[in-house]
């Protein structure tokens, strides 16, 4: 017989491991209407977990990883939520921005052991972006925050900081 244990790291609004957590939200506001929806969803998820958010704004998706790294160096944050949108255009710039921002965020998360939710949308059209960003529809901002919170809960459990 094989023993099996499953750790459920999905954040719950009353999870004491998340209370007071300091979440850094780095948003690219290149597309304001999309950014507004992503941010609303992320902030609602963070508030539901009884965590605290600090929001900083950068010009575009490529600036998000550097801004997150700079602010993580302060030691003031437990997790990061990255929010932005890259819409395919007529040149190859989309591929560079989408790929490099995702790679840099993954590197940041793994190398620094920081929980990170990637809410940078990569889409073909603005309509696709709005559908994914809207809180009432796909709520990808909320999903990114929940991902960061879920990994933070898991990290705290692994570090022994979770109340029993």
UniProtKB/Swiss-Prot annotation:
(2S)-2-hydroxy-3-oxobutyl phosphate binds at residues 90-91, 132. 5-amino-6-(D-ribitylamino)uracil binds at residues 30, 61-63, 85-87, 118. GO terms for cellular component: cytosol; riboflavin synthase complex. Coiled coil: none annotated. The keyword Transferase applies. The active site is at residue 93. GO terms for biological process: riboflavin biosynthetic process. Pathway: Cofactor biosynthesis; riboflavin biosynthesis; riboflavin from 2-hydroxy-3-oxobutyl phosphate and 5-amino-6-(D-ribitylamino)uracil: step 1/2. The keyword Transferase applies. Keywords: Riboflavin biosynthesis, Transferase. It comes from the Bacteria. Belongs to the DMRL synthase family. HAMAP family: Lumazine_synth (MF_00178). This is 6,7-dimethyl-8-ribityllumazine synthase. The lineage of its organism: Bacteria, Pseudomonadati, Pseudomonadota, Alphaproteobacteria, Hyphomicrobiales.
């Amino acid at each position: 017989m094989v023993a099996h244990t499953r750790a459920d790291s999905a954040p719950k609004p009353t999870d004491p491991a998340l209370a007071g957590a300091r979440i850094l939200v780095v948003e690219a506001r290149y597309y304001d209407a999309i950014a507004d929806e992503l941010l609303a969803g992320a902030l609602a998820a963070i508030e539901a977990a009884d965590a605290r958010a600090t929001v900083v704004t950068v010009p575009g998706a490529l600036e998000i990883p550097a801004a997150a790294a700079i602010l993580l160096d302060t030691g003031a944050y437990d997790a990061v939520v990255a929010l932005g949108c890259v819409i395919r255009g007529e040149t190859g710039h989309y591929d560079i921005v989408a790929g490099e921002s995702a790679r840099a965020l993954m590197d940041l998360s793994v190398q620094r052991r920081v929980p990170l939710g990637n809410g940078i949308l990569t889409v073909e059209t603005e309509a696709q972006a709005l559908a994914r960003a809207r809180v009432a529809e796909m709520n990808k901002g909320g999903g990114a925050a929940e991902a960061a919170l879920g990994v933070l809960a898991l990290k705290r459990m692994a570090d022994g900081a979770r109340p029993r």
